[in-house]
Every structure is written in structure tokens, then in C-alpha cells.
């Protein structure tokens, strides 16, 4: 059995025979996008490109972003969030499995009233972390200042999109806070929990 991305048949309008395309290309044609890994520059650029392309192709049809991510890099995650706010179609966000760290930030960035979690999904928020522990003192201070700015940005977005007070979000981001789907709904990160 071959290992890799599964292929599915797809027939373009006006064609008699179907051609085999990988499952993700087929789903993209239906405006279904997937973040199923840690956020990095590569997946961020792919999702941004798809959202912009699909928005240009038809700005009246909504986009659906399925999320199962342990988090990842802050700047590429913020770029995905900003693109979701920029494109004209509404972006539905659907948490399946885990939306942690940057994954939860992208989840909360979906169109308000169109953010959903599957019943057994988990959501986790926390403050951004630095990977530059071995930097010189001067570099570390600059890094810490940038980290504080990023933390403030993320906190403001969570406050705006959840309706929670600033002090609650700030306190919760001090540590890893895990939530069930219903707890994430009560917190305001998602609007709906899918029924079993």
C-alpha cells in the first residue's frame, strides 16, 4: 500500500472523465482548509496563499479552516490570523483534536458566531515563549521587549474576540490553561460545540 497523501477522483465541470487529485486539492476546491501541524512559515504561507486565492476566485463563499495544531511560531500564526481578518469571505474555524497556543489564537480569529469545536476537542492558551535562551545579554533584553509586545498583541486580540476582561485573559495566559470544548465556548474562544 502506498504511503502519502490519498488521491480521490475529481471531475471538472464540462469534462466526462474524472482525474485523480490528492485529497487536499479536492477539499481546497470546496473551500475547506486544514491546519493539521505545528504553525511554521511554510504552512502559514500555504494557508495565506490559499485564503487569498479563494477570496479572489469568489469573495461571496465562506472559507472553512479545520484546526488540529499544537501551536508553533508566533509571527506566522499572527500572519494567518491577519489574513483571516483581511479576506472578504467569512472564515469559519473548526477545532478538531487540539488547538493549542497559536492554534487557539487562529481558532479565536474565525468569524464571530462561526467558530466551532468538536465535542472532544481541547483548547489551550498561554503566553508566547522565546527560543533564544542562549543569546547575549543585550540581545536577550531586545528579545524580551519584543516578546512583551507580542504578548500584549495576543492578549488584546483574545480580549476583543472573547469578551473576557483584560485582567482575566492576562492572568490565564501566565500559564498553560487547557479547556474542553464547552469550557472554550464559555470562555468565548468558540461559539458552538458540535453535537455528538
From Swiss-Prot:
It is found in: Plastid, Chloroplast stroma. Its EC number is 3.4.21.92. It catalyses: Hydrolysis of proteins to small peptides in the presence of ATP and magnesium. alpha-casein is the usual test substrate. In the absence of ATP, only oligopeptides shorter than five residues are hydrolyzed (such as succinyl-Leu-Tyr-|-NHMec, and Leu-Tyr-Leu-|-Tyr-Trp, in which cleavage of the -Tyr-|-Leu- and -Tyr-|-Trp bonds also occurs). Keywords: Chloroplast, Hydrolase, Plastid, Protease, Serine protease. PROSITE patterns: CLP_PROTEASE_HIS, CLP_PROTEASE_SER. GO terms for cellular component: chloroplast stroma; endopeptidase Clp complex. The active site is at 101 (nucleophile), 126. One of its GO terms (molecular function) is serine-type endopeptidase activity. It comes from the Eukaryota. The keyword Cytoplasm does not apply. HAMAP family: ClpP (MF_00444). Component of the chloroplastic Clp protease core complex. This is ATP-dependent Clp protease proteolytic subunit. It comes from Coffea arabica (Arabian coffee). The gene is clpP.
